[in-house]
Amino acid sequence: MIKFSINMHRGCFGGCAFCTISAHQGKFVVCRSKESIVKEAKKIIAMPDFKGYISDLGGPSANMYGMHGRNLKACEHCKRPSCVNPMVCPNLITDHSKLLEVYHAVDALPGVKKSFIGSGVRYDLILHKSKDEKSNEAAMQYARELITRHVSGRLKVAPENTSDRVLKFMRKPSFSLFYEFKRLFDKINKEAGLRQQIIPYFISSHPGCHEEDMAELAVITKGLDFHLEQVQDFTPTPMTVATTAFYSGYDPYTLEPIFCAKTPREKLAQRMFFFWYKPEERGAIERELRRIGRADLIAKLYDGVQYHGRARYDAKAVGSSPERPDKHEQGRGRRQGQEWRDERRQTKGQRADRQAQAQRENGQRQKPKRTSFNPNFHPKTNKRR
């Protein structure tokens, strides 16, 4: 728990393949009463160092408060791991009215200047169109109040990937829903005269995700004007479907083989696409795109601007051998390339003599050569004292 934050409910019916919340908190959302939440808010207000800002009114997913099945008996016998994937269950009540009542009650307390939502928001629940029009209206009202009153400047959401194939295995909604939510977010911001941001969370190296998927993710997020920061590499966690697939190499439901990036080089080859905008990553990204046969994405990522930078030595494509830094790779001229090859042909002793001569010419004192860090060895004679 973060100081000055209030946990309103526990449990999550999202059932994401990489998440353990449903395993240790349960699939059914258990909510605190509005009176209990207001009572805790009053205790926070009474704290001597409280400045009037509640950092979070949330839970595992901020907007699952008050949601449950219409027929609870059917829920008790249901074997679906997720109530919202591949589509929202028709038995699920997705009304945001109770959540809005809590927000209004907390904001009305004297001493509360503003209450923020720091937990992640499920935008698929906001955009879901149910048969109940009042529920749909409450969802739009929630979106407007959330964006205009309860965002500190950045709203956190978790699309996790852009490939629908990978998202299907993750049990996450299609990325097209994120486009729709971003349009709604931008529209409300424009109408309210705000300049707030969406902060999307993404995962690399998830089972089923390839380098090509991450390359397309980089192109798509660039088109949305994102410079990603809130990212992580997939970490196997007990009691999850994704970890079962990572360990076994098979989809546990279909028993079909599934690709998993496991070695550090394979993981780095995916992770670096998050940071396409960093100059030090460009050389490795271009080599990797050529290796996987997607050189067409280079122009989309870098707008056709030719790369003349110097890449890191270890940032080479997965499975490739170290390349010589010749004029074609690093923009060196023929003379510089020849000097580099001549220097590589020199023996260790020749290089040491050359360095010593350069130091003498520059008037620098030549430091004694030490071949061991053992204090029992003399640095000049290299013999034991």
Give the predicted meaning of each segment.
Residues M1-T20, V38, I45, K51-G58:
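N-terminal pre-triad scaffold of radical SAM enzymes
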Residues H206-G223:
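Catalytic cores of alpha/beta
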Residues M1-N7, G26, V84, F275:
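Flexible inter-domain linker/hinge segments
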Residues K43-I199, I203-P207:
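Conserved SAM/AdoMet-binding glycine-rich loop
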Residues C19-S36:
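Iron-sulfur (Fe-S) cluster-binding segments and ferredoxin-like electron-carrier domains
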Residues M239-R385:
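Radical SAM enzyme core and accessory elements
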Residues H68-S97, K168-M170, S174-S176, K222-L228, ...:
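Radical SAM enzyme [4Fe-4S]-AdoMet core and its adjacent flexible, acidic
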Residues C12, C16, I37, V157, ...:
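Conserved, mostly hydrophobic/aromatic
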